From Swiss-Prot:
Keywords: Ribonucleoprotein, Ribosomal protein. One of its GO terms (biological process) is translation. This is Large ribosomal subunit protein bL19. It comes from the Bacteria. GO terms for molecular function: structural constituent of ribosome. GO terms for cellular component: cytosolic large ribosomal subunit. The gene is rplS. The keyword Cell wall biogenesis/degradation does not apply. Belongs to the bacterial ribosomal protein bL19 family. This protein is located at the 30S-50S ribosomal subunit interface and may play a role in the structure and function of the aminoacyl-tRNA binding site. The keyword Ribosomal protein applies.
Amino acid sequence: MHAEEIIRSIEAEHFKETLPTIYVGDTVRVGVQIREGNKERTQPYEGTVIAKRHGGINETITVRRIFQGVGVERVFLIHSPRITNIKVVRRGKVRRAKLYYLRDRVGKATRVKQRFDREL
């Protein structure tokens, strides 16, 4: 076997087939599995997708939310075994591929209009 075939076979084991279609501007709830001591639990993280990068097994999404008045961004590798589930809460209507301009906005200016022509 060539190196590429070995890499593809390993990637195929971790590739998640049942993920929803995620677009930039969507509000998503990501279930992240965390370990506290010897216990594991799923912690939800909800926010707006401001960027999507790469493709295939290396696909990442950057999710931004405001927590106690401070903007928090997390980058999730969506095919990671630590991600238990991803649910689209609402669709956003945007005209950019990257929403980095939301970092400079405060309060109600960070809202994204809702899009109704795509299914959840």
